[in-house]
Amino acid sequence: MKIAISGQDWSEGSLGYKIKGILDDLGVESKILKDGDSPSAHNADIVLVAGGDRVILDHSHKVRDFSVPVLGIYESDSTGFLGQVDVSELESAVMRLKKGDYEVDEVFRLSVKVDGREVEPVLNDVALFPRKSATLLEYVLKVNHSDLWHDNSDGVIISTPIGSTAYSMSAGGPMVLQKSQVFIVVSVNSLDNTRRPLIVPNDSNLEITDILCRYLCDVVLDGGKRVTVRKKLECSKHDYPTRFVRVIKDSSAKIIEKKVKLAEELLNM
C-alpha cells in the first residue's frame, strides 16, 4: 500500500511530521505531497490529510479530476467534522487500511463558474456577498435557466448536503443528510419573507444573474478563497466527487448529532 500525506505544516512536532513518523515506524511506504503534486501521479492508494476541516477543504479544491480516497487525520483538540481519525489512533487505522477493512464514501462537489470562468470546485458551499458588509445585494436566481425569484438580501449561499451543517445552517438553512442528492439555496436576510431556504435536485443548473450592488461583490469558495464577480455565478454538480475513506462507520445522523452537541456546548459557555 502506498500512502500520500497532504498538509500545510511539516515542521518538527507538527501533525504532518507525526503522521510521517508513525508511517515510517510501521514500514508503510509514504510520500509527502508538495504544492501542485497530484496523489495519482505518485500512484498513491490513499491520501492522509493532516489537519482540520480547512486543510481537507483546501486539498479537495486542488483535486479537480479523479480523487484518490482521502482520510482526514486530526488532533484531539479539533472541532472539525470532515476528519475521522485522531492521530493517537492512526496506528490501528493503518492496520485496518492494510487489511482492506474500510469503505470509500463518494461525496459530490459543486462545480463553480464566475462570469463564465471555471474556478475551484467546492465541497461545502459557495456564497455570494457584497465586499462591503451591511450592503444590500440584488440578484435573480435561475434554476435550469428559468427565473425562480428576484431578491434583495445581504447575500446568497448555495450548499451541498455535507455543507448544510456549516455556513448554510448558520444562516437558517436546513440540516440535510449527507447522501441526499440535492443542493440547498439560502437567501441571507432577504427583504422578502417568502425567500425561504430552497432545496433543488443536484442535477439542476443554478445561476445567480443580474447582480446589482453599490460595491464589488465576491464569490466565497468554502469560506476561504474569494473571487470577484460582476455579472453571473453558475453552479452545478461536479463530474468528480471527493472520495472519503471510512474506517469508522458514522452515519449522516451522527455527524449532525455532533454538530448539535457542539452548538449546545458553545451556548453553555
Regions found by a protein language model. Give the residues of each.
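Gly/Ser/Thr-rich active-site loops/lids in small-molecule metabolic enzymes
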Residues: H150-T194
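Catalytic core of DAGKc-family lipid kinases
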Residues: S76-D154
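Short, solvent-exposed amphipathic alpha-helical segments in soluble enzyme
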Residues: K18-I22, R64-D65, G172-V176, P201-D203, ...
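Short glycine-rich anion-binding loops that position phosphate/pyrophosphate groups of nucleotides
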Residues: G52-V55, S76, I162-T165
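ATP/nucleoside-binding phosphotransfer catalytic cores, i.e., glycine-rich phosphate-binding loops
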Residues: D115, E120, L128, S133, ...
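ATP/NTP phosphate-donor binding region
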Residues: M1-A50, V55-D65, Q84-E106, K113-E120
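Short glycine-/acidic-enriched loop or helix-start segments at secondary-structure transitions
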Residues: D58-S60, F81-L82, E138, Y167-S170
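Proline-centered loop/turn at the N-terminus of a beta-strand
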Residues: S67-L71
